[in-house]
Structures are given as C-alpha cells and as structure tokens.
Amino acid sequence: MNFGKAILKATRRGEHTRIWEYSQAPLQWLGSPGEPPVYYLRNPNGGLLGGDRHRIEIGLGPGSALEIRTQGAMRLHPGLIRQQVKVKLAPTSQLIWIPHPTIPGAGADFRQQVQIELDPTARLAYAEIWTAGRLAMDERWQFEHLANCLQVWVTAGIPSSPEGRKLWLQEHIDLHFPHRQVSAASVLGSHLCWGSLYLLGDWPEPTWLTVHISGTESPYWLVKSPDPICKGWILRQVGPQAEAIWRHFGQVALQLAQAKGGSPQGW
C-alpha cells in the first residue's frame, strides 16, 4: 500500500521557465533542461499496486509551457487502486501530456478521477490509452473493475456562470467483469486497445495521420467542439496495439506544438 504524491508547478519569468516540484514515493519527477522543460513522471514499482492511493497535481502559470512524459506503460496489479489527477492551466500556457498506455491486469480494480481547468487561451494535449489486459501473456478482459471519470472546466469568459467557470466536457468509463458489453461488436468488437487524444484550447486545426498496423488500418473518429469559447478536438482510436495508438497521438501533439512555434523534443 502506497500513498504517492507528485506536484509540479511551472511559472514563466522572461525567457525562462521556473519549476517547483514535490514528490512522495513511489511517484518521482525527473526533469531535463530546455525550453519548454520536459519532465518524466516515474514509478519504480513497475505499476500501481493494490491499496495504492496516488495524487498528481500540475499547474501552469500564464505563458508557461511544459511537457510531461512517462517511461513505460502503467500496469495495474490486483486489488483496489485509486488515483486523483488535477491539472490547472492559466492563460496562454501549454501542456503536452501523452502518457503510455494503461494495462489493467487480472483482478485489478482501478478508480481514477481526472479534473482539468483551463483558460480558453491555454492549450492542452492530453491522452488516455487503455488495453484489455496483459495481451503479451494472452490475458484479455480479466480485470475486475475500471472506472475513469474525466472532467474539463473552462475557467474564464463565462459571464453566465456564478463560479466563473463551466463544465465543458465530462466522460465516464465504468467497466465491470466479465466485460461482455464493451467487447460486443457494437462497442469495441475484436479491438483490444482504445484511446482518446484531447486537444483542448487554442490549437491550430490538426492533420490526422492514417495508422496501419500489420497492414490493417486502425479505425479512428474525430469530434470537434462546437463551443465558441473553448475550441478543441477529440480523436478516438482503436486497434490491436496500444503502443501504435500512443505513438500516433504523440506525433500529432508534436506536430501541433511545432506549428505553434515550440521546439519540443522528438517523439
């Protein structure tokens, strides 16, 4: 049982970004110099264990930019695991966070809440990628429970809201063993991996790449925000390999960051 914590805040001072970070084992931050800064979120335990409760908080000040990466897939071990993620983006800030896929193993009960607040002039590229289990071990749909709640709040330019913000997007995954509904032909069918790329805020319109895996096109769907206050696109993709979806999402995010004049490290 672990109570991990990872907090990171970025502020812009002239031409440089200042970083304040705090971590509590087993979560760790590992940063590298450059503009924008790149920080890795690490967990040396090789995954999340039953009984773990983790909290991740990321805040970007006005005009700051940051990229967060992971070192490998997040494996979920048997037992109840809870994780809470909070992200807050100030005006004209930019965060790119495309984590590796999440792999729920047999008996895992994973419950995650992700809350994002952003100014309409900020930019966020964030992804969630999931698999049906430890596919390399021929394990499919053996996890006990997978619950993931994502909320996105727009925090400025909302005169009709007494709180000065409005709920812009809410999505909820709630999968229970034996997972007959999600594996039905009308949902995922034979696909064992799925993911969503959220491009929120002031991004240029992206160019989507067609991905082929073992000679077969990996299906995807695009949703564009009709909201005049906060622009955005959501890319949904399914396929047999989560790594291919992750690389595709990373390439799209890199392309957009370069179009905005940034110089992020290659994917």
From Swiss-Prot:
Places the protein is found: Cytoplasm
Keyword Phosphoprotein: no
UniProt KW keywords: Chaperone, Cytoplasm, Nickel insertion
Gene Ontology molecular function: any one: nickel cation binding
Cysteine-cysteine disulfides: none
GO CC annotations on file: cytoplasm
Keyword Chaperone attached: yes
Pfam families: UreD
Function per UniProt: Required for maturation of urease via the functional incorporation of the urease nickel metallocenter.
Complex and partners: UreD, UreF and UreG form a complex that acts as a GTP-hydrolysis-dependent molecular chaperone, activating the urease apoprotein by helping to assemble the nickel containing metallocenter of UreC. The UreE protein probably delivers the nickel.
PANTHER family: UREASE ACCESSORY PROTEIN D
Entry similarity comment: Belongs to the UreD family.
Protein's name according to its UniProt entry: Urease accessory protein UreD
Upper taxonomic lineage: Bacteria, Bacillati, Cyanobacteriota, Cyanophyceae, Synechococcales
Protein encoded by which gene: ureD
